[in-house]
Regions:
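Small-residue (G/S/T/A) turn/hinge positions that recur once per unit in extracellular repeat modules
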Residues: 74, 107, 168-169, 192, ...
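All-beta strand scaffolds that present successive hydrophobic residues in beta-strands
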Residues: 77-79, 110-113, 135-136, 172-174, ...
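Surface-exposed acidic, glycine/proline-enriched linker/cap segments
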Residues: 138-169, 173, 211-220, 225-229
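Extracellular polysaccharide-degrading/modifying enzymes targeting complex plant/algal/animal polysaccharides
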Residues: 1-106, 111-126, 130-164
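Short glycine/acidic-rich loop motifs that flank beta-strands on beta-rich extracellular proteins
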Residues: 64-66, 88-94, 99, 121-127, ...
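Active-site neighborhood of glycoside hydrolase catalytic domains
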Residues: 199, 204, 208, 220-272
Length: 272
């Protein structure tokens, strides 16, 4: 019924269906799911409490993205008036490939307008980084370099991958309703340069609190070079707008932001 269930760490936790204390929606957090492998099969369990899954709308999301080019460099595409929802997107850190339910994938001149974007496991819109096999999660995979050093490397290596005004950025995101995504409404590392983000309603981001850390916000950008963020209404998010490294020439103006903080009744999430 358009409500994401909370992932349990064990079948016992799923069956118990107890409140997840960091959640901004305590009662909603009692609806759980759990999965385990049985040979070649994946077995799913869910706690619907008194609701009958045979009568309600139950969806299992496995698609990683909704509208996102497989290759980089597919520029000048307009997406207008769509409802884009429910994708099993993955965590989008700045030192690795960043995906979202929709995004230009390292290209130029996209317009995403008048769309509703909702229920992404991680990010709604990604204006972010391409996949670089020579600089992707090395801290986790090879225990080499800190994530901070990987970010420094990404700035230099971006030149090898066409990070020039002629090729990348200059996107427009406008009049979209972006909500109930669990990492960011809009994320972008380097790929958002020279873009305009305006007149959007961004709300209820990261309210489940299953994810935490330094990449959570209504809008979270690295290298927001000459980006204009204006006339957006952003509320009920874990932080409103966060422009991280390389916020050169960034203009944030005429936005309305409120209630972008953890409610008093919530505990801190792990990593939050």
């Amino acid at each position: 019924n358009d409500q994401m269930l909370y992932e349990a760490e064990s079948l016992e936790e799923c069956i118990a269906g107890e409140i997840y204390k960091p959640s901004w929606d305590p009662q909603g957090s009692t609806f759980k799911w759990f999965s385990e492998q049985d040979g070649d099969e994946t077995v799913l369990y869910a706690n619907f409490h008194t609701q009958d899954p045979n009568r309600e709308k139950v969806e299992i999301n496995v698609r990683r993205r909704c509208f996102f080019p497989e290759k980089t460099g597919c520029g000048y595409i307009t997406v207008h008036g769509f409802k884009i929802e429910k994708a099993a997107t993955t965590w989008a850190p700045p030192a690795a490939f960043q995906d979202g339910m929709i995004g230009p994938h390292w290209s130029k001149g996209w317009i995403i307008e008048d769309c509703e974007i909702t229920n992404s496991k991680c990010c709604g819109i990604s204006l972010g980084k391409y996949y670089d096999p020579e600089n992707d999660h090395y801290f986790t995979k090879k225990h080499l370099k800190s994530p901070t050093q990987m970010e420094r490397d990404a700035v230099c290596r971006g030149q090898y991958h066409g990070w020039l005004k002629e090729n990348i950025g200059s996107h427009i995101i406008r009049r979209c309703n972006i909500h109930n995504c669990e990492q960011t409404g809009i994320v972008g590392r380097m790929g958002a340069v020279y873009s305009v983000i305006e007149n959007n309603h961004i709300h209820h981001i990261n309210n489940m609190q299953e994810l935490g850390g330094a990449e959570i916000s209504g809008i979270k950008l690295h290298a927001a070079i000459d980006v204009v963020i204006r006339r957006n209404h952003i509320h009920d998010c874990t932080m409103g707008v966060w422009c991280d490294w390389e916020a050169q020439g960034t203009r944030i103006t005429q936005n309305l932001l409120h209630h972008n903080e953890r409610p008093a009744y919530c505990t801190w999430a792990v990593g939050g």
